[in-house]
UniProtKB/Swiss-Prot annotation:
It is an enzyme of class 2 (transferase). Its EC number is 2.7.4.8. Transmembrane segments: none annotated. It comes from Baumannia cicadellinicola subsp. Homalodisca coagulata. Coiled coil: none annotated. Essential for recycling GMP and indirectly, cGMP. SMART domains: GuKc. The gene is gmk. One of its GO terms (cellular component) is cytosol. Pfam families: Guanylate_kin. It catalyses: GMP + ATP = GDP + ADP. This is Guanylate kinase.
């Protein structure tokens, strides 16, 4: 199963995903996060190949010409994209995958795949979003205001998703994310594929 996770900048999405991957009890089955390619500069603390693959605009556009991306979008004048090969190599091993992408990428994937569930994460208020962006210390006030305006434009698309999480309290939001993924992993359509051999033996 492929899980699309989208949220405006500053909502806490990256922290939630990293916490989810560190959780030992949940989800029930193995899950990995796809590492996207981007043309933006690395931020302090980021590691190439762990947070993103940081490449040039020329390299990115060459990959576009090669139809290498499952999805891609231009956000804040930077490219972001998910390589088709990386996603396929994970899914072929019956491992669930998380895609940290925006609504534009989600729309592209929905058009070509059916094995998808989508989750949209929003902040409890604009004031709280502003506080988080300011606390992050990465942008000037003008850029923060631009990000908030962009966040509103992104949040308009929340009804296009299967699930909605309000990240007011981090631990509650993490629990909600765990619950959604565990429920999907237990869905009949997924379980009968995952345990096809076991079920076949039981019914002989």
């Amino acid at each position: 199963m492929l899980y699309i996770i989208s949220a405006p900048s500053g909502t806490g999405k990256s922290s939630l995903l990293q916490a989810l991957l560190r959780t030992k009890r949940l989800p029930l089955h193995e899950i990995r996060i796809s590492i996207s390619h981007t043309t933006r500069a690395m931020r302090p603390g980021e590691i190439n190949g762990q947070h993103y693959y940081f490449i040039s605009v020329e390299e990115f556009e060459k990959l576009i010409d090669q139809d290498a991306f499952l999805e891609y979008a231009r956000v804040f004048n930077h490219y972001y994209g998910t390589l088709r090969q990386e996603v396929d190599s994970i899914l072929i091993n019956s491992v669930d995958i998380l895609l940290d992408i925006d609504w534009q990428g989600a729309k592209q994937i929905y058009a070509i795949r059916k094995d998808v569930r989508s989750i949209f994460i929003i902040p409890p208020s604009k004031d709280e979003l502003h506080r988080r962006l300011h606390k992050r210390g990465q942008d000037q006030e003008e850029v923060i205001n631009q990000r908030i305006s962009q966040a509103v434009a992104e949040m308009i698309h929340y009804t296009e998703y299967d699930y909605l999480i309000i990240n007011d309290d981090f631990h509650t939001a993490l629990s909600d994310l765990n619950t959604i993924i565990c429920a999907e992993q237990l869905h009949m359509n997924n379980q009968k594929i995952r345990y096809k051999t076991l079920i076949s033996r039981l019914l002989q």
